[in-house]
Structure formats: structure tokens, C-alpha cells
Amino acid sequence: MAIEAKVVWSEGIFITPQHFQQFERYLESGLRQLAVSQEGHFWGFSSLVLNSDGLKRGVIGINEAEGVFPDGSVFLFSQKQLENLSLKVPANIKDTKICLAVTLPSSVNNEIYFPDQDSSDSCRYKAFNKTLADTTNTELDGRQVTLADLNPMLVLENDLTSGQTALPIALIRSSSADFEIILDESYIPPCLGSQKQPHLKAYISEIYGLLMQKSNSLANAVNDPNTGGC
């Protein structure tokens, strides 16, 4: 994704919301490009906890998610953002990935979903109101400001569009006719670190144990005079 063009702030211009929107796109696109350019594959989860309580009913959710999307968008979703995030998986599917997705940035489509709108699926952000204090003088009354968080969604990999960036969270081994989901427990989502991923952590611990065992064995052999050691 290209870096957005910079706004020219010149004397006498009539400032409109588009100026600030483009200025924000310029800054955000630069940050995303910086994240991506640090390393070719610098994306994945630094933390991921699935909500599997509804698997027998064909529903999967997320309790915790933090990381970087492939386009460089950084995320740390709050409990409020995740509490209504779930996917009803169709019956009779198998070997299909479930993905956490957000809409890619756009300069031509609506990016903000407001509560009075019908659907939020195509919007990158979801708006909400919050009263903020003036931090130069906190004795003044706060002012209500409209803010927006990233608008995450769960989708099957086959249903992803070119207008979304996504990370797979799980692999469905099968879903039965009555919708019960069976996940592939050996599947490892893309990760930025190993210590919060149980499978990777276990593999590393096992390798470490084998190396220590081999190291001790070699050390004993070297120090044993009966085997030609010192």
C-alpha cells in the first residue's frame, strides 16, 4: 500500500474536514509502512485468546487479541470491542480458516460507522461518544467528542474481500450438520512471539531440553578418562 500524499498547508486556504482526514491518512499510512518495512513478515498476533464456549452451537469468538495486521495496522482490541465479536459457522464445512479482519483504509469510501446506521461490515472504524477533559485546565467542564475504534469482524477465509486485511485465528477441521465446530488443535496462527503461543512454547521447551541433554552427555564424555577425555 502506497504512502498517502501530504497536505499542503498554505496561507489563506479554506480548511475543511477533508484536509484533516487526508492529513490523518498521510500520518497513518507512513506508520503502517514503517511497521511493514521493519521486516518482511512483521505481522501476526502478540496475544490471542479464543472464546470457545459456543463451539457446540457453531459459534466462535475472541476474548483477547493484540498484534499487527499484514498491512501494518497495529491493534489491541478492548473487551468492549470483542464482547459482541463472534461468527456463526455454517454447517458441513471443513478445512477452512476463520480470520480476524478489518476493512483497509480508503479515501473514497465511508470509513466510519455510526450507531444509527444499518450495517458496520464495510466500515474500518466504529464511532462512539466520550466526554474528554481539557488537560490544560481540568477545572473546566468536559466536552463530548466523537471518537472511533477499529471495527473488527470474524469471517471465513473464503469470504474475505480485496478490501480487507486479515489474520487467521483458527482452522476448522469440520462442522457437523447440527453446527458443532471441531477445531484443528495443532493449528498455529501467525505469531510475533513464541511465549504466548502454547504450541510454539512447548516446541521450544522440548528442543531446549534435548539440547541440554545432549550437552550434558557430551560434557560427561569429554570429562571421562575412560573414553579419551581429560
Question: Which residues are covered by each model-predicted region?
Answer:
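Glycine-rich, compositionally biased intrinsically disordered regions
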Residues: A2-D116, V222-C230
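N-terminal accessory/cap region of cofactor-dependent oxidoreductases and related radical enzymes
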Residues: N84-L156
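Mixed-charge (acidic/basic) macromolecular-recognition segments
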Residues: R124-C230
